[in-house]
Amino acid sequence: MAAKDVKFGNDARVKMLRGVNVLADAVKVTLGPKGRNVVLDKSFGAPTITKDGVSVAREIELEDKFENMGAQMVKEVASKANDAAGDGTTTATVLAQSIITEGLKAVAAGMNPMDLKRGIDKAVAAAVEELKALSVPCSDSKAIAQVGTISANSDETVGKLIAEAMDKVGKEGVITVEDGTGLQDELDVVEGMQFDRGYLSPYFINKPETGAVELESPFILLADKKISNIREMLPVLEAVAKAGKPLLIIAEDVEGEALATLVVNTMRGIVKVAAVKAPGFGDRRKAMLQDIATLTGGTVISEEIGMELEKATLEDLGQAKRVVINKDTTTIIDGVGEEAAIQGRVAQIRQQIEEATSDYDREKLQERVAKLAGGVAVIKVGAATEVEMKEKKARVEDALHATRAAVEEGVVAGGGVALIRVASKIADLKGQNEDQNVGIKVALRAMEAPLRQIVLNCGEEPSVVANTVKGGDGNYGYNAATEEYGNMIDMGILDPTKVTRSALQYAASVAGLMITTECMVTDLPKSDAPDLGAAGGMGGMGGMM
């Protein structure tokens, strides 16, 4: 086991604070509308330019191990805020730095660290309740666009794109961000349910100009098995031919004689058919077939529940207004399933999302909800260079997370104003002893830090602006972009309540632990092996190689 270096008391805390300050100072230059960029060197390729707090934090690793411990703990604050709300990482870092700095001053002055932590926790719990009370629901398109704009660093086009995407696919719809091909940002909306499986034979194509299969008002046969014998399907094919409608077959696979017969029937115009493989694998495939059945009002023909393909009737088939199939995807538009059944299925999947343990499962379940509930929107980010594309894409993703958080828990006045108002409302809060009261004051002082940093990044005097804002009430604050005072909500400067709440809670959590640190232990650096170059009669020649 390697030898350890141990530091106690003030020595340990001073080192830790130095690490905290290095990381926080690098992150906080990005805060606010006039925040600056940070350039991150990469071991290969061009450097990355970012204004995203958590991206900056993740890059920082310090040489001194004690300082690095402090930096890594604040990195945890940024990461946790990012995981919970997808934004607010810089705010969380600024709050943590302020609580740690003020808290360690109090410890150095002889306060009890445990009581300080209890005071901080008490103030934060009260502040969270007040934030919830201040929160205003965010439901209309204008508010969503404003939240997106602020989070994308005052880029109005991004805010509008996100609001438009949410309008089109609903609050539950899936919105993804991809690299675009041009200079302009684009929004691509896929309505209905789309899955990544194309036609099984190009002979099904009936729109040669687009290379797609389009079926109007088709019946949809869903089978959880491989179909290779055409005899199994004859009763269904005959019934569909009599009805004079096209048929879409979604099965585990359609092969051999069955596929050949379907192709011949289609080419002769006896019955218009297209076949695709079912999406997913294993249990996920069964679940997705059931989703399609719910959406189209059909039944999955599965031997597990004793159903046989030969005995299937038109009642077992689903229906949709239109189906479009190309070589990679199938889109079912306007299934005829009952709204109540679809909502029931969505609720069931939501329950599974709550219980999911892995991010991958959660993401896949979320996609299934979106496909049932509305559709999928893709924001294609346009930029002139790859470096700009990466930076912009990160901003758009942040803005998307922020708008989701706003829809979930509502919004409060932005620009650090909400925390100032909350601090004034709980200013009379008292702890059980004087040390706890100091802890409460430390937390209240920290709640001013985001506003002060935003103002500092504008080149103005933080104390003057902070006092003016404190003198106002309600949503009165300072618009750093235009350097004007006024109603923040009217000016469209909003922060999602969830982002502000998460930033405060995670900052206080980690800062409280750091204030109560009394000892730090790390590995001693390994000393280099002695230089053996002088051995073997080469006196005085050591290190010549």
From Swiss-Prot:
Name recorded for this polypeptide: Chaperonin GroEL
GO MF annotations in UniProt: ATP binding; ATP-dependent protein folding chaperone; isomerase activity; unfolded protein binding
Annotated residues for binding of ATP: 30-33, 51, 87-91, 415, 479-481, 495
UniProt keyword annotations, A-Z: ATP-binding, Chaperone, Cytoplasm, Isomerase, Nucleotide-binding
Source superkingdom: Bacteria
Enzyme Commission numbers on file: 5.6.1.7
Self-association and partners: Forms a cylinder of 14 subunits composed of two heptameric rings stacked back-to-back. Interacts with the co-chaperonin GroES.
Main location: cytoplasm
Job description of the protein: Together with its co-chaperonin GroES, plays an essential role in assisting protein folding. The GroEL-GroES system forms a nano-cage that allows encapsulation of the non-native substrate proteins and provides a physical environment optimized to promote and accelerate protein folding.
Catalytically driven reaction(s): ATP + H2O + a folded polypeptide = ADP + phosphate + an unfolded polypeptide
A cellular-component GO term for this protein: cytoplasm
Species of provenance: Salmonella agona (strain SL483)
Top EC group: isomerase
Cellular compartment(s): Cytoplasm
One matching Pfam family: Cpn60_TCP1
Family per record: Belongs to the chaperonin (HSP60) family.
One of the GO BP terms on file: protein refolding
Lineage, opening ranks: Bacteria, Pseudomonadati, Pseudomonadota, Gammaproteobacteria, Enterobacterales
